[in-house]
Amino acid sequence: RCHFVVCTTDCRRNSPGTYGECVKKEKGKECVCKS
């Protein structure tokens, strides 16, 4: 499972102030940024 903390960290690295949301991709799960 994609953890929220991991998503948040990834999003902050690219876009500070955003939160991460886990979405299902063909290869496992991937984190995307949501404002």
UniProtKB/Swiss-Prot annotation:
- What's a GO cellular component annotated to this UniProt protein? extracellular region
GO terms for MF: potassium channel inhibitor activity; toxin activity
Pfam family of the protein (one): Toxin_32
Its annotated compartments are:
Secreted
- Disulfide feature: 2-22, 7-31, 11-33
Extract the InterPro entries matched here.
Toxin_32
Q: Where's it mainly located?
A: secreted
Q: Does the keyword NAD apply?
A: no
Q: Which family does it belong to?
A: Belongs to the short scorpion toxin superfamily. Potassium channel inhibitor family.
What does it do? Blocks Kv1.6/KCNA6 potassium channels.
Question: What is this protein identified as?
Answer: Tamulustoxin
- Native species: Hottentotta tamulus
Organism lineage: Eukaryota, Metazoa, Ecdysozoa, Arthropoda, Chelicerata
